[in-house]
Amino acid sequence: MKTLYILDGSSFVYRSFFALPPLSTSKGFPTNAIYGFLRMLFSLIKKERPQYLVVVFDAPAKTKREKIYADYKKQRPKAPDPLKVQIPVIKEILKLAGIPLLELPGYEADDVIAYLAEKFSQKGFKVKIYSPDKDLLQLVSENVLVINPMNDEVFTKERVIKKFGVEPQKIPDYLALVGDKVDNVPGIEGVGPKTAINILKKYGSVENILKNWEKFQREFPRAKKEDLELSYKLVKLYTDLDIELSEEDLKIKRPDLNKLKQKLQELEMKSLLKEVDKIFRQASQRSLF
């Protein structure tokens, strides 16, 4: 079975920046996010030897969720300038390395990942998603796994049930009930994880709660119907995206090795230069390009 590896690029970059101490070239250009991102990427390539790999980024344009709810993710701090300047460099390196990258204006990386996972799992691919984002757990199925790159935790259907008490397809219902402070998703006041699990055992889904709202509100007098409807719209991933991709589009291409090494030299990343030679020589010998 063919395997498609999907990396949540925005999350990788963000976490690399804050996980590592400040690093910069002798000219003062910041490099910690670049270094951390490439370390994780090269480690994945060495371990998994992927043939199909895509890195997905959030697009800079306003998203559909922000249009629905102006306060969505509003309390998240804006990316600092030393992080912002590193993102175009990471994208340039990916292109030089022959690794497909994808972003779609109006949609978050999560939505593009959801689209890819659904489309290519239906085509018979095994899909492995590398991201710490719990929203993506709604995609887990027999042929779709989510791996947290921070601790290598692998989420199968059984693992999702054990950790959250609900099946993967119920994760949006669960998150709509409990809310998400990080993303500013309101949820239902007074409903925590245990209560949400019990609610879903009784009602089955957010859709069914809304159909039986009077009964539900007698149990939870502080609940607001509009909050639940909004929360579900915010946590449910979009998969009906207007893009067409083939298997070939997601295949790792032959790298421009000279320019790639030149770029790493500019960034003064000597340790990664050695890895690049080793990784792409092995890939060439396996005739992946």
Swiss-Prot record:
5'-3' exonuclease domain ranges (all copies): 166-256
A GO MF annotation of the entry reads:
5'-flap endonuclease activity
InterPro entries assigned to the protein according to its UniProt record, in alphabetical order: 5-3_exonucl_a-hlix_arch_N, 5-3_exonuclease, 5-3_exonuclease_C_sf, DNA_polI_H3TH, FEN, HhH2, PIN-like_dom_sf
The UniProt entry, under Pfam families, shows:
5_3_exonuc, 5_3_exonuc_N
Extract the Gene3D superfamilies matched here.
5' to 3' exonuclease, C-terminal subdomain, 5'-nuclease
Report the SS bond pairs.
none
Q: What is this protein called?
A: 5'-3' exonuclease
Top enzyme class: hydrolase
EC number(s) from the headed UniProt entry: 3.1.11.-
**What role is this protein assigned?**
5'-3' exonuclease acting preferentially on double-stranded DNA.
GO terms for biological process, alphabetical: DNA replication, Okazaki fragment processing
Superkingdom field: Bacteria
Keywords, comma-separated and alphabetical: DNA-binding, Exonuclease, Hydrolase, Nuclease
Organism in which the protein naturally occurs = Aquifex aeolicus (strain VF5)
